[in-house]
Amino acid sequence: MSMTTLVILRFAGIFAAYTGLTVLLPAIMFRRILVGRGLSEQFLMCYTFGNFYIINIVFAVQLLHISGFWALVLFTAVPGILIWSRVNRVSLRELCIKTGIICKKILQGSMGMRGALYRVCNRIKTVLKRSVRLFYYKVICNTLQWILVGAVIIALFWIYGRNLLLTYGYCASDIPVHLNWINEMVRGNLFSDGVYPFGFHCMIYYLHTVFRVDTYAILCVFYLVQVLFIHMVLLAVMKLLCRSLYLPYAGVLVYILGNLWAKQTYSRFGASLPQEFGMIFVIPSVYFLIRFFQTEKEKLKTRETKLLSGCFALAFSLTLAIHFYGTMIAGLCCIGIAVGFCPRFLNKEYFKRIMMTGIISVFLAVLPMGIAFAGGTPLQGSLGWGLSVINGGKSDTEDSEDKTIQDITMEEMAARLNENSKNNIKSNNAKSMQTKRIPAMTETPESTFADKVREIPEKIKKHLEYDGSAYRGIYHKLAGTMVCICGTYRNCSCHSAWSDIYYPAKDYLW
């Protein structure tokens, strides 16, 4: 099997598994609620709940330290069956009794296998008839719109899908860090590097554990799954908010094909990154909030309004559970929507409900991280840095810089002492040099600016006399690392500019 065929099959399998978990499973669970709604709204509701459901299942089993294949399957199936029976008003007790009676008849011989197969075939025929009828009304009767959907998908594969075949790699330097965190989850170590939004990592971990696909292989192809759903969610929201029937397709196609923004804006779509995954749920949160404010005051207590506010809470909590940047953007969008609906936002009934929904959404996202933090897991470095900046204290970056400066100073001092030990013949000079450096290690009065200027020529002369092997080793390692990195991603469109600059250094060094 060629590498191209293998990559295509892997992508198809991961896309089918992810779509089944996040779209098909919620569609079965909430079939009665979704009946009568448009296909776009059904898709948004299913996709939002599906991701929230899977991500929090992983959080639950990880925090309980029972994570594994069977734990994930049971925690997915059992609550799913209970929700399905409750929403669709199906009595599990009666269903189990009927199934038990049929099995008993088969075992007793009062019902033959032909009779049992006849019932199963009739049930399958009924499901197939419903599927054909649904396909006719949703697809055949809207042929032109589905042709435009196909055009959007073809454009996505042309712009982003080619990189899947041309460059089999991560295409982003920070993906190995996320890979390590996911591998630690396999070992039962949630938040191995500290508390951090792990929604993206939970989804990749679920696909790896349940469907037995290597994590590194998922991260190589999952970016295209993200890109497809980003644009499908965008198209669905535009179809729901725009009065024009075909303008949403034109807008999405222009966004895909038009080179309107900086290259970095598009290149990040070529890698499986949490930030881009979290951006998906900014769009549903905007839609559900607009729909909530469009509801009349008399209908605020209806089940439909509660459903819309619940979907908004799930979507907004997903932005916070996956990446903080998505939450910032969603928050700015919510502020803009509140300004647009200012009279209703300031109304007591609307304000009370939307604030309560926002608090619940933040609580749902922070709860797993809060449990881990309360259990003794420290915050990840980026979170600690953000909190220190907010509090006005010294950031972790400054601390690390101070530590680096101290380390460099100690290395220089060690190199100088080593040089002095080699020159045993010039012991008197070595002693004088050591005595000159002793005041640098103790508290001495600060020298004036003129003294420092006069010391510069002497310091330059001393540095030129020292053996620069240690410094050359550092420079060679740094250059070799840059060559390795840029050589690895040379074929990637996201790193072509960097590789063209650094890759010729290979011939010079090696």
For the regions a protein language model found, what residue spans apply to each?
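Perimembrane helix-loop-helix junctions
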Residues: I329-F363
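Short hydrophobic/aromatic helix or loop-helix immediately within or flanking a transmembrane segment
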Residues: A60, V177, S192-T215
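Membrane-embedded helix bundles of polyisoprenyl
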Residues: Y47-V58, V149-F157, F200, F222-K299, ...
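Membrane-embedded, hydrophobic transmembrane alpha-helices
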Residues: M1-I140, C486, R490, C494-Y502
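Periplasmic/ER-lumenal interhelical loops and adjacent helix-loop junctions
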Residues: V195, G199, R353, T357, ...
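Membrane-proximal lumenal/periplasmic loop motifs of glycosylation machinery
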Residues: L165-C171, V186-H201
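Juxtamembrane segments of multi-pass membrane glycosylation machinery
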Residues: S2-T4, I66, M203-V225, I230, ...
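Transmembrane signal-anchor helices characteristic of membrane glycosylation enzymes that use polyprenol
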Residues: V23, C141-C171, I360-G376
